[in-house]
Amino acid sequence: MILYEDPIENETTIAYISTKTPIIPSICDVLVTRGTPSFDETGLKHNSVVKLNKIATIKTHFIAGLLGTADEVLQAEVNKALDACLKFAPQE
């Protein structure tokens, strides 16, 4: 999942997506499952988990293609989980 694109450095920050969904997700996991409104837009074919404790920055040219998009609901879930997982300080 693309978290951030830096056009100046030509780099993209991504989070790992796996089809091995945990029985009990951690605070760093965001489940993307069939039957939820967000699932269809993602282009994923199976229930999946976005692992926000597995983040990498890669050169954009290594990205072969995109499957779909994250709707506003999924983006909000990812942002909330990122805050919890990385323990960002609350904004004042």
Model-derived segments and their meaning:
Residues 2-92:
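Conserved functional hotspots at enzyme active or ligand-binding sites that engage polyanionic ligands
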